């Protein structure tokens, strides 16, 4: 930084890498990883292609070295120099000019090494030696066989590395390595800013910011010294820049600063996301030393937990308002971390906002995302449920392990605590529940260590470094101490009876969870995504060797077929089966989410598993690895709409009737509900109609409804005892003025028995719109271009006979492209034609 005594030099230099012991070196990219460098240099095949995963896994039996040469200057009198590594994955030895300066053993930490007197004037050689993670966990497991998820490799619990790199029930065995974040040389004469902690005090018409600024002396970058507490010559100045550019400047080491008429930050769909830039400048005797710059949002955020008529509430409370959380669980974006960039993350999170998310849960089996992830969540209004990086395992809490994870916690809490989007810290994924059940536990000390880690160590760290952010000991949990972690009437729940338990979709309605932080259903990715890992038609069968290698949940393909036979007719073509699986997934999650939202106030969170994939695979994701939206993501856009009409129908499906056992009588009715997740009362016109399969109206009704802010309203039940369950359906809509803001349809039999007529789907293009026409009721209308990568304003929708207009919004892709390029591609592909189908075509 110009004019500051603390200098920061990034090693954006030329790097090279090789397999340790080999004479041949190859150009390397830092930040990056071993796999991405080997791919770039033609030294490995695509690990995602067919079963190449295993050849890629073998490469991690070896050690690797990275090396760069940089121009340095010797430390002057009074200066100290430090090497800073923001991300090393994972077991490394570091050498400067052939002298070992340190080693690392945690990818979740920042590592800094004192190199004062070791940097020469002129050329310096920096070398990083990566030890095989496979050899490391093998040796550690042989010494201490501590256990965890059976989907991962034995010993993964012994290394502070993203657990899912060793395999998961959606992930491959690809434990990549490398320098995945920047490397810097720090030169300082007076130390630096360690951290700035900003607490907010909200009152009517103003917000007071309270500042706790600490510094590190140049001799010890782990030592924290409060600024302004002693007469040592250190002072700081604060500048706050409002969204409109107005500046507030506070000099002379202010402990607080008042912002009048603040613009508050709200989650997406509830309000705006104005951000204030905060600059803190540290000086010594008037000489600028260092600067800290971040963006913050002005808001209060905690969890509202209090006894109520159903048990105990559990809701995000933002600016005093309880908000229903709507979103999905986020996993690492790519098995190859070198492919994750600010641009790829932006594309993914913008797709969350496009689908009306207001929250994401960062799952604990990966790694703490980059700063840009949280910056984007701040910008887009996505509340973050942040797991600490522990999942589905037990740990042996040795003194060394405890010291290691304490530093990990401090690093990440300091790094992330200022973010407006940070909704809560959570201790781990699914460990309280499984440890209580005795899963993976082989000795009593593992239970003791669990309690110590998540109910003592982490709370101690947070009490010191981030007391303002809510802490939850595990997910799921009812509050800790193994007190019924999956209690449906308290805390959060992971519900898997639909899917893992093979229960029908209707089972969701047996529960009124306070907050569902995991529930899911699998589907296959798009056909064009499948072709990225196999182009052989012999593989295009869900039980082929290659397709099962890209399905990591045991028995899941058969499970999809089991649910398929319950719901739809059997498809005779592979591509139709892919479509049917996505419709199953979308219908399953819709069944749950709409039920949870109808019971707003009792249930206050629906976070489905999962948002994304880290490689091309059959999974629970709503956006596949290539960025293509599955049917579920379009459904999410509708069932997470700020104002939504939904239907609680009683039909053959809810009765779970067995038509071959006996004559049965079951209720045929609907009860509509409108839920409003905005800060304004909404006046809507609700319309519904009983229709024949050709979409002709048998009986139509409408009702004007006022839905108070942040609430849901039920309409009266409508019974249809004489409905033709095989040939009639109900359509329903919510209108605000002249705009239909939400709609849907229900039938009274299983879809496989309903007598769908051929809707004779057709389309025409008008500017940036696709106009779809149907001559009968059509369920799940899918619009595809040849490369299956259009992003539309709506897709996989139900429609009665007539027309529906759909806007072309963009192109789905993991790659960052010039908008002009994809616009031209879309025009070319539209000229080649579109493919339309519906549930009628599942046959």
Show where each model-derived region lies.
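The substrate-binding groove and active-site-proximal loops of carbohydrate-active enzymes
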Residues: 107, 169-172, 266-267, 329-341, ...
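Active-site neighborhood of glycoside hydrolase catalytic domains
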Residues: 397-480
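Secreted/periplasmic carbohydrate-active enzymes, especially glycoside hydrolases
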Residues: 1-359, 489, 598-599, 628, ...
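Generic structural signal for hydrophobic
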Residues: 351-352, 377, 416, 596
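Substrate-binding clefts and catalytic carboxylate motifs of secreted carbohydrate-active enzymes
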Residues: 9, 17-23, 29, 33, ...
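Hydrophobic faces of well-ordered beta-strands that scaffold small-molecule active sites
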Residues: 326-328, 360-362, 384-386, 515-517, ...
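Loop/turn elements at helix/coil->beta-strand transitions in domains of secreted/extracellular proteins
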Residues: 323, 355-360, 378-383, 418-424, ...
């Amino acid at each position: 930084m110009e004019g500051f005594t603390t200098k920061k030099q990034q090693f954006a230099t030329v790097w090279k890498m090789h397999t340790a012991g080999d004479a041949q070196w190859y150009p390397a990219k830092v930040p990056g990883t071993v796999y991405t460098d080997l791919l770039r240099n033609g030294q490995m095949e695509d690990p995602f292609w067919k079963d190449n995963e295993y050849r890629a896994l073998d490469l991690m039996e070896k050690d690797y070295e990275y090396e760069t040469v940089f121009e340095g200057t010797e430390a002057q009198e009074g200066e100290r120099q430090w090497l800073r590594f923001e991300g090393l994955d994972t077991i490394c030895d570091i050498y400067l000019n052939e002298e070992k300066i340190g080693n690392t053993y945690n990818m979740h930490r920042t590592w800094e090494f004192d190199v004062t007197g070791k940097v020469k004037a002129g050329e310096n050689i920096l070398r990083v030696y990566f030890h095989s993670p496979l050899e490391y966990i093998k040796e550690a497991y042989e010494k201490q066989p501590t256990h965890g998820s059976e989907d991962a490799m034995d010993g993964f619990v012994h290394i502070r590395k993203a657990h899912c790199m060793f395999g998961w029930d959606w992930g491959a065995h690809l434990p990549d390595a490398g320098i995945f974040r920047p490397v810097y040389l720090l030169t300082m004469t007076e130390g630096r800013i360690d951290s700035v902690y900003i607490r907010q005090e909200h009152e009517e018409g103003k917000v007071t910011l309270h500042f706790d600024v600490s510094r590190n002396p140049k001799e010890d970058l782990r030592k924290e010294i409060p600024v302004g507490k002693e007469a040592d010559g250190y002072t700081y100045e604060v500048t706050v820049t409002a969204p409109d550019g107005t500046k507030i400047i506070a000099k002379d080491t202010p402990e607080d600063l008042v912002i009048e008429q603040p613009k508050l930050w709200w989650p997406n769909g509830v309000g705006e996301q104005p951000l204030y830039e905060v600059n803190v400048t540290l000086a010594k005797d008037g000489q600028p030393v260092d600067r800290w710059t971040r963006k913050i949002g002005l808001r209060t955020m905690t969890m509202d937990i209090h006894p109520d008529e159903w048990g105990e509430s559990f809701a995000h409370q933002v600016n005093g308002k309880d908000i229903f959380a709507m979103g999905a669980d986020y996993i690492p974006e790519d098995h190859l971390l070198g492919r994750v960039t600010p641009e790829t993350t932006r594309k993914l999170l913008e797709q969350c906002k496009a689908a009306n998310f207001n929250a994401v849960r960062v799952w604990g089996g990966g790694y703490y995302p980059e700063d840009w992830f949280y910056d984007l969540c701040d910008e887009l209004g996505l509340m973050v449920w942040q797991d600490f990086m522990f999942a589905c395992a037990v740990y042996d809490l040795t003194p060394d392990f405890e010291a290691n994870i304490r530093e990990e916690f401090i690093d990440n809490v300091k790094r992330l605590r200022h973010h407006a989007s940070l909704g809560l810290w959570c201790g781990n994924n699914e460990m309280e529940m499984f440890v209580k059940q005795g899963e993976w536990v082989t000795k009593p000390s593992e239970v003791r260590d669990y309690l110590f880690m998540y109910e003592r160590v982490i709370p101690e760290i947070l009490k010191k470094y981030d007391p303002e952010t809510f802490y939850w000991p595990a997910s799921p949990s009812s509050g800790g101490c193994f007190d019924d972690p999956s209690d449906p009437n308290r805390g959060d729940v992971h519900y898997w009876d639909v899917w893992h338990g093979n229960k029908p979709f209707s089972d969701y309605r047996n529960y009124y969870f306070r907050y569902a932080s995991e529930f899911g259903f699998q589907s296959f990715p798009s056909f064009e995504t499948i072709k990225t890992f196999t182009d052989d038609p012999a593989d295009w069968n869900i039980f082929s060797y290659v397709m099962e290698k890209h399905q990591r949940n045991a028995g899941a393909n058969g499970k999809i077929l089991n649910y398929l036979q319950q719901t739809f007719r059997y498809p005779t073509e592979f591509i139709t089966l892919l479509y049917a699986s996505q419709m199953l997934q979308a219908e399953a999650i819709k069944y749950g989410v709409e039920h949870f939202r109808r019971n707003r106030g009792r249930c206050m969170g629906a976070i489905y598993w999962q948002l994304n994939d880290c490689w091309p695979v059959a999974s629970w994701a709503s956006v596949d690895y290539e960025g293509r939206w599955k049917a579920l993501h379009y459904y999410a856009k509708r069932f997470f709409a700020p104002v939504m009409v939904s239907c609680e129908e009683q039909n053959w499906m809810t009765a779970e009737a067995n038509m071959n056992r006996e004559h049965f009588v079951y209720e045929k009715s609907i009860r509509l509900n409108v839920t409003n997740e905005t800060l304004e009362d909404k006046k809507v016109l609700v319309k519904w109609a009983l229709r024949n399969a050709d979409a002709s109206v048998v009986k139509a009704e409408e009702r004007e409804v006022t839905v108070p802010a942040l609430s849901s309203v039920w309409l009266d039940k409508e019974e249809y005892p004489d409905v033709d369950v095989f040939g009639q359906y109900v359509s329903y809509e919510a209108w605000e003025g002249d705009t239909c803001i939400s709609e849907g349809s229900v039938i009274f039999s299983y879809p496989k028995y309903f007598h769908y007529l051929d809707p004779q789907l057709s389309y025409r293009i008008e500017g940036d719109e696709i106009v779809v026409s149907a001559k009968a009721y059509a369920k799940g209308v899918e619009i595809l271009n040849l490369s299956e990568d259009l992003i539309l304003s709506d897709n996989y929708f139900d429609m009665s006979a007539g027309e529906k207009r759909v806007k072309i919004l963009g192109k789905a892709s993991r790659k960052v492209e010039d908008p002009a390029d994809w616009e031209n591609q879309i025009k070319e592909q539209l000229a080649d034609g579109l493919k339309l189908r519906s549930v009628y075509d599942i046959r």
